[in-house]
Amino acid sequence: MKPTTESQQGRIDAVGRLEAAIGRPLDVVNVYHQWADDFPSASDFQFVQQGKILLISWNGNDIRSILSGSQDAVITARASAIKRLAEPVLLRWRWEMNRPNLQKSIGSAADYIAAWKHIRTIFTAVGATNVGWVWCPLATNFSATNGPSYYPGDDQVDWLCTDVYPGPTDASFASVSAEFMTWAAAHAKPIVIAEYGSESSNPDKAQWISAAAAYARGNSQIKAMVYFDADRVENGVDRNFRLEGTTGPLQAFHAMVTNTYFDQRKGG
């Protein structure tokens, strides 16, 4: 969810508004941090104190600079800070690495994998054992964008992950994620859907959300889903995924998250 004001309190308030709208606390909060950010932040600590699991989306630096060793101090500082948090954290470093517009900074798949292993080695040396490593490509055109080639290996990854967006044709969650889910079935790893959502321009947004929930219920490998409750402008186009201010979509999401299957407090 996007805060009204870009501040630590703004982030906390944004989560609180969404929780009030859906009628229950969130179990997982996806927090975004740039490469050089000092995190966990004050709002991150607050979310942990509220009993939420942090899914930290850590934006990647240029891969070549990571491999050169010039970023080791940054990596060590973040590993030490997360270790001090002393609570389980899901770490999603440089997600959507197969996205075409990221290829200049990513380099080759081999470079990406080497950087992943370099970062994880430093975290291990620091003793940040409370980290679950989340590998998260974009679901759209997973095979055509060579998504599988970026996989660091079962020994390097704790959680599989993908981001699912319907695109301009309002394609279903099932169809967009199909290639990734087929690939993931061959790996004995839990899956978190770290971002998913339908734009307000979709007249069937509520149905899309309900169908996504039904799909997840039918696939036991999916253990968590995080809705992308934000709006953003891309190439001059307003893309609004938000639930607040809607009726049908918000009701569909409320029905999903209060169902015992998705609400771990109710035994889901």
Predicted regions and their residues:
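Short acidic, S/G/P-rich loop/turn micro-motifs used as interaction or catalytic elements
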Residues: W35-D38, N61-R64, N98-P100, T140-F142, ...
